[in-house]
Amino acid sequence: MGFERAFVESSPEQENKLFVGVSYMDSSNKNQDPSESNNQISFGGQHQHHQQQFFYNHHQQQQLQNNNQVSFGMMQQSSSAIPGSLISKDSAGAYDLGELDQALFQYLDGQEPSSIQEQRQNSGMRPPTLNIFPSQPMHVEPSTTNKMNTGLVSPAISGSKRSSQPSMELSNNLKNNDAPSASGPEPPKAAKREGNRKGPTSSSEQDAPKTPDPKTLRRLAQNREAARKSRLRKKAYVQQLESSRIRLTQLEQELQRARAQGYYFGGNSLLGGEQNLPVNLANMSSDAAVFDMEYARWLEEHHRLMCELRNAVQEHFPENELRIYVDNCVTHYDEIMNLKSMLTKSDVFHLVSGMWKTPAERCFMWMGGFRPSELLKIILSQIEPLTEQQLMGICGLQQSTQEAEDALSQGLEALNHSLSDTIASDALSCPQNMANYMGQMALAMNKLSTLEGFVRQADNLRHQTIHRLHQLLTTRQAARCFLAIAEYFHRLRALSSLWHARPRQE
């Protein structure tokens, strides 16, 4: 059996005491209850109950013993502190402390010496030595089997515990310093294992997809939306190119049909001699050809919009739905005005000549388009009944439009007279003076450039008239108004077709 021994030095008033796995009370505490004293008895295993009973029965005998007691703790110090009369024998030598322990606990347990010897052999107990350097860390508790074999766990009083704790800490420090090879490499191994444990975790965290922040998600959504809009614009552009190609093919076919019908100048004409070019191709610019193609597309789209509007009016659509069709018509008129504005800058004579119109429409043209005042007279009877306020507004619009038309007409007439006078200012003889001729042509071109301004003002007047009607009329009245305008120009185009298809008299 293993024991834990401690050597305690007493104060001058007390003698040295002997503790064999237990602490005894002083003689001054004779009348006290042993259960309430600070001395505690701790025995391991199955012998604890017998040991407590023994010490209780022999309490009186222990008080009569000599006060000089030897502590089982440190072997060398205890031998110097024990009186010779107590444990010294004859010259043969001192009592062995292990034999004293064996005899004492043999008496306590009532066991045979042979059983004690077998128990010591089975437990592999080493000779009792000073256990300053424990073979195991202090915080590791021994197993229950070792406790059963050893039998006792030495108790100590509070004073001895306080005195033994610094010595235990010192022994632990000495153990750590003396045997670095035993405990030193273990923390690095543990750290290495921990690092190995953390390694896959960190790599897995790096491999795991990171959730982007809201700003990145918003940017990704914006990029996707921009890409989607770009694809839609590209698709619309491709469709527009395809439709333009189809329109160009149709225009070429119309030119071929016109050439087949005999729209040529004579062989000695001023526009190409014997080249036999059609009139509409002799002096047509590229901008004029594009405008004719876009105008043909605009006519088809206008016809579709008018069919939808007529269907909505006939089926008595609600006011809000009907307003959508009316707004589409106004927007469509704005589109043709923009096309004419671009052509005015590049080829104003193409607009004024009316080559993009049918012959019947050309008869009623005024400065590259219809007269707004005449249009108001036509539709006034088609949008009745009108309120008094609406009637006054339309009459005022008609009057202001008529005044603007008269002013533009007078300006255009003055331009024509001035241009004619400039050209005929010099003698109209064939061998003319080249210096005077070039001066007259430069002056005439300068005056002719004002024609662009007249055409632009006329288009603005037509545009304002359309929008003013849209504002004065209700939604249903505006729908009937646009249907009447579309039907009017459709009949003019039909008249031209009928005129070309009429039977020829010989």
Swiss-Prot record:
Residues 241-255 are annotated as: Leucine-zipper. InterPro entries: bZIP, bZIP_sf, TGA_domain. It comes from the Eukaryota. The keyword Transmembrane helix does not apply. Its main location: nucleus. Residues 207-216 have a biased composition (Basic and acidic residues). Residues 288-502 form the DOG1 domain. Residues 25-45, 113-124, 142-152, 160-180 have a biased composition (Polar residues). Binds DNA as a dimer. Interacts with TGA2.2. Transcription activator that binds to as1-like elements (5'-TGACGTAAgggaTGACGCA-3') in promoters of target genes. Regulates transcription in response to plant signaling molecules salicylic acid (SA), methyl jasmonate (MJ) and auxin (2,4D) only in leaves. Prevents lateral branching and may repress defense signaling. This is bZIP transcription factor TGA10. It comes from Nicotiana tabacum (Common tobacco). The gene is TGA10.
